[in-house]
């Protein structure tokens, strides 16, 4: 039985090394695959019962493990929707059948509908822009779509304009003014209306404010500012109702509260008016915190989604599926969601990709070792076969 056992063990060793060569071949083939996780063949011995004075050789068992938790290198790309994770966590993606998986392969691009999909055909899932981390569930995530609607026109209705008017200014001659500033507002079609705001000193602590349409010089709003003679703080007259109705707009409430009359130059500390022209989307950025931000032609930015990350207690125990995606299992533990840079998750890096964690030099070394071991095991089988042939021929 020992010669049969010797041959059986040799075959077992060859099969084991063949498995190792297969994983090495996979690793080498996927050395440039985004998000690929290295496979490794692990060995364990199988001991068979033996009797006193007679050894019954056993065999070797193999098991394939993946280095899912080992991060690969990160390289830069030119696409803002190429995403890599620096640290813990996995992207949550949806397959063609609607099932959800985890992955580190972040080569996402918009499809014809604007949905972000990676090279393996899995769609990136995200949470709402205002979603709280504590309320995250996989079922509550949606496919990230970057075809944001164009910003509509919005007429101006409110603004804040805060200035300092020099206390040393003198009242100008009739028809004159001391200071002038131009502000931009919008009518309901999103067309610009330039407002000229004139400040004219009319008394020791009194100023007249006149708002005119710069296009035709028509006065469309006025107020009188009164300041405290001791502190220079505004006492009354801090609101101007600017009537844009004749120009296709609404009444704009221009707030001058916080303005002062003190020594120094004429300065502006705040000048903001709401409203906007219609604007189409220019591009999409993704922040380290997972915020997917639409950038519009007029410079406006709007958060569309927040990309959560997922993790499990034992990532290396997840089931590997084609396409560099992973399926949580009972051995890996339950999925836990959180936003990047919090909840123990890493950060998302836009314009980068995580490379394969397979090292070509190490794989070639492993291949040579497996080749030598395979050859040695074949020699064991060959020797056992030759000895068996000697035994069979003893009767001749």
Swiss-Prot record:
This protein's GO cellular component annotations are: bacterial-type flagellum basal body; bacterial-type flagellum hook; cytosol
PANTHER family cross-referenced by the UniProt entry: FLAGELLAR HOOK PROTEIN FLGE, FLAGELLAR PROTEIN
Which Pfam families does the record match to this protein?
A: Flg_bb_rod (PF00460), Flg_bbr_C (PF06429), FlgE_D2 (PF07559), LlgE_F_G_D1 (PF22692)
Query: What's an example Gene Ontology biological process for this entry?
Result: bacterial-type flagellum-dependent swarming motility
Out of the domains of life, which is the source?
Bacteria
SS bonds (residue pairs): none
Which keywords belong to this entry?
Bacterial flagellum
Family statement drawn from the similarity comment of this UniProt entry: Belongs to the flagella basal body rod proteins family.
Where in the cell does this protein reside?
A: Bacterial flagellum basal body
Q: What is the lineage of its organism?
A: Bacteria, Pseudomonadati, Pseudomonadota, Alphaproteobacteria, Hyphomicrobiales
The gene name on file is: flgE
Protein name per the record: Flagellar hook protein FlgE
* Summary of the knockout phenotype: A flgE mutant is attenuated in a murine model of infection. Four weeks after infection, the number of cfu per spleen from mice infected with the mutant is significantly lower than the number from mice infected with the wild-type.
């Amino acid at each position: 039985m020992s010669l049969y056992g010797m041959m059986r063990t040799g075959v077992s060793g060859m099969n084991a090394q063949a498995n190792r060569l297969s994983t090495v071949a996979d690793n080498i083939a996927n050395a440039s695959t985004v998000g690929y996780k290295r496979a490794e063949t692990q060995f364990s011995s199988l001991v068979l019962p033996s009797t006193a004075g007679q050894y019954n050789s056993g065999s070797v068992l193999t098991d394939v493990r993946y280095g899912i938790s080992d991060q690969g290198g990160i390289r830069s790309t030119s696409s803002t929707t190429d995403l890599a994770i620096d640290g813990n966590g996995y992207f949550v993606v949806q397959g063609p059948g609607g099932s959800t998986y985890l992955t580190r392969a972040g080569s996402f691009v918009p499809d014809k509908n604007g949905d972000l999909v990676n090279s393996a055909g899995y769609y990136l899932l995200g949470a709402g822009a205002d979603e709280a981390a504590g309320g995250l569930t996989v079922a509550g995530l949606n496919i990230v779509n970057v075809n944001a609607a164009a910003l509509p026109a919005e007429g101006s209705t409110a603004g804040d304009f805060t200035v300092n008017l020099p206390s040393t200014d003198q009242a100008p001659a009739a028809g004159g003014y001391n200071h002038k500033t131009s502000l931009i507002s919008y009518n309901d079609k999103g067309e610009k209306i330039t407002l000229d705001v004139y400040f004219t000193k009319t008394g020791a602590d009194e100023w007249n404010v006149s708002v005119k349409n710069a296009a035709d010089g028509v006065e469309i709003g006025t107020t009188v500012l009164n300041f405290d003679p001791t502190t220079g703080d505004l006492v009354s007259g801090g609101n101007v109702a600017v009537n844009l109705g004749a120009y296709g707009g609404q009444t704009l409430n221009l707030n001058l509260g916080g303005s002062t009359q003190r020594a120094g130059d004429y300065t502006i500390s705040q000048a903001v008016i709401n409203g906007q022209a219609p604007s189409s989307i220019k591009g999409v950025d993704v922040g380290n915190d997972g915020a997917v931000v639409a950038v519009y032609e007029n410079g406006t930015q709007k958060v569309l989604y927040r990309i959560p990350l997922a993790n499990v207690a034992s990532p290396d125990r997840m089931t590997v599926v084609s396409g560099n995606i992973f399926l949580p299992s009972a051995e890996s533990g339950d999925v836990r969601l959180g936003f990047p840079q919090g909840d123990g998750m890493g950060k998302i890096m836009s314009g980068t990709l995580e490379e394969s964690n397979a090292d070509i030099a190490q794989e070639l070394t492993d291949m040579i070792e497996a080749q030598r071991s395979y050859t040695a095991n074949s020699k064991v089988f060959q020797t056992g076969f030759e000895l068996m042939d000697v035994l069979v021929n003893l009767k001749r």
